[in-house]
Curated annotation (Swiss-Prot):
Keyword annotations: Glycerol metabolism, Hydrolase, Iron, Metal-binding
The protein's role, per its UniProt record: Catalyzes the hydrolysis of the 3'-5' phosphodiester bond of glycerophosphodiesters such as glycerophosphorylethanolamine (GPE), a typical phospholipid metabolite.
PANTHER family reported in the protein's UniProt record: CYCLIC NUCLEOTIDE PHOSPHODIESTERASE CBUA0032-RELATED, PHOSPHOHYDROLASE
InterPro entries, alphabetized: Calcineurin-like_PHP_ApaH (IPR004843), CNP_phosphodiesterase-III (IPR050884), GpdQ/CpdA-like (IPR026575), GpdQ_beta-strand (IPR042281), GpdQ_catalytic (IPR042283), Metallo-depent_PP-like (IPR029052)
Note on how the cofactor is bound: Binds 2 Fe(2+) ions per subunit.
Protein name as annotated: Glycerophosphodiester phosphodiesterase GpdQ
The keyword Ribonucleoprotein belongs to this UniProt entry's keyword annotation: no
GO biological process: glycerol metabolic process
Record lineage: Bacteria, Pseudomonadati, Pseudomonadota, Gammaproteobacteria, Enterobacterales
EC number(s) stated in the UniProt entry for this protein: 3.1.4.46
Binding positions for Fe cation 2 per the UniProt entry: D50, N80, H156, H195
Catalysed reaction equations from the record: a sn-glycero-3-phosphodiester + H2O = an alcohol + sn-glycerol 3-phosphate + H(+); sn-glycero-3-phosphoethanolamine + H2O = ethanolamine + sn-glycerol 3-phosphate + H(+)
């Protein structure tokens, strides 16, 4: 299994920029082009929420056009910037697993050695996250049915504070209910989130929990400063690879850079250079 995982695309309407100066639509189109050009082709691309910025139909039209150019299956979940009804109307053609109920978007992918569960943690009208009773019950049933099969959950909001002064107040408010399932089910070993616009990792019992960078603009990690900073540090995504029982996640840069070059030991330490005595 190989998954490319991006997050927080924050598409805007045609010819509109984020915050008046960030061309997220062009940036995301470039990300799609880079993913389509990967030398090792993923089985699917995950987008973990905040697909658009303002929840408007015009934004979803752009998102569907740009994301629809990906040459891989899409696995989508909404975030707090998304409008549930518009999200489903415009993006279900790209991800049929979303179903038909905007209030109950969740699904399981059982095609790989690890089971993948996708849930909606968004709460309409709020930046913070919330897990509904139906979502928690569904997760419990899925984990019970899967037995010992390793399971990864994908959601938008992290289920616990991560020491980020700006983002912790708008994490998943009742994420403890998911952590309780981690305690009950040893098979729940990974939780991947968006929302925080930076790569942050922690461990809870047997579960590795991570938030992803965004595709365009980032939020710096500050432990004490609560002011709402953002910046244009280089974007990246995560690649999730599983071979046998081993799952490896690694960061893949989405910035433009020189290379790659093949390593050549003959030019690393050229033989014609005189080595000075120590």
């Amino acid at each position: 299994m190989l998954l490319a995982h991006i997050s927080d695309t924050h598409f805007r309407s045609q010819n509109h920029k984020l915050y008046g100066f960030i061309d997220v639509n062009a940036g995301n189109a470039d990300v799609v082009s880079q993913l389509n050009g990967l030398r090792e082709r993923p089985d699917a691309v995950v987008v973990s929420g905040d697909i658009v910025n303002c929840g408007r139909p015009e934004e979803y039209q752009v998102a569907r056009q740009v994301l629809g150019a990906l040459r891989y299956p899409l696995l989508l979940i909404p975030g707090n910037h998304d409008d549930k009804a518009c999200f489903l109307e415009y993006l279900r053609p790209l991800c049929p697993q979303l179903g038909s109920d905007p209030q109950n978007m969740r699904y399981a992918i059982d095609d790989f050695a690890t089971r993948l569960l996708f849930i909606d943690s968004s709460l309409a009208g709020h930046a913070k996250g919330w897990l509904t009773d139906n979502t928690v019950a569904w997760l419990e049933a899925q984990l019970s049915d899967a037995g010992d099969k390793p399971t990864a959950v994908f959601m938008h909001h992290p289920p616990l504070p991560l020491g980020n002064a700006q983002m912790d107040p708008i994490a998943c408010e009742n994420g403890h209910r998911l952590l309780a399932l981690v305690e009950r089910f040893p098979s729940l070993v990974r939780i991947f989130c968006g929302h925080n616009h930076n790569l942050t990792m922690t461990q809870y019992r047997q579960a590795t929990i991570a938030t992803l960078p965004a595709t365009v603009h980032q939020v710096p990690y500050c432990h004490e400063d609560t002011r709402p900073y953002y910046d244009m540090s280089p974007p990246s995504c995560l690649m999730h690879r599983q071979v046998g029982e081993q799952w490896v996640s690694y960061q893949h840069s989405l910035a433009h850079y020189a290379g790659p070059w093949l390593y050549d030991e003959h030019i690393s330490c050229p033989t014609d250079e005189r080595r000075s005595p120590c």
